């Protein structure tokens, strides 16, 4: 259950619901499969395989999951059936089929096929960190992260959460660290970065598995480019890519965390419990340290 990418939202800790209230509210928005002519269905589902509950609590961390099921109806299938219908009318009735009638036939075919269409499903997990006051979403895509936040707000009747907004931008800090050749505190430069320039056609430079202190890399900053993604290692526990919109990508949890979780987990439930606490504590502590180097939160 180790999150590989993260979007996060600072929360108002004083206005978080009680665990029992959260579970009850999510149960009122529980996932149900697509029915009849529904194109998709969305709702909260059990976040772990070994429990039917909609919230998996591990101390001060609460794991939830939003499940989405979508009908899969390829446009080519509809088009082939439509072509057959049009040809049948032309042959049997000796007339052409107009645009409006074709559209009506297409809608009828779609309605006939939808109840029998295959489905695909996806899940987005999120953790309420009630100690540090963060909602951690296991997705760096803004649309996915905003969607589960919206669904939580709808289910709870409101949730005070905001996009991370620091006094200094992540891009500015990353550019400064790359230019000076080292980071602050518990952070170290890793081996990947992305830089962007300015202009009508924005030049993009991607650096992978290289020494980021090398002259040819630093020269890009001296030439006016800014860092939009930067590979970092935090306290020999987590390696990740920090982005300009303050999301974390390609997260790797180094051996010390994995081994500690395994030493505390004898079965699936206890391993998930330990992993959830260790991951959340490490990520949230790291985020707080990053925020401090970004000048703190905007008022």
Predicted segment positions?
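Intrinsically disordered, low-complexity, charge-rich terminal extensions
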Residues: 1-299
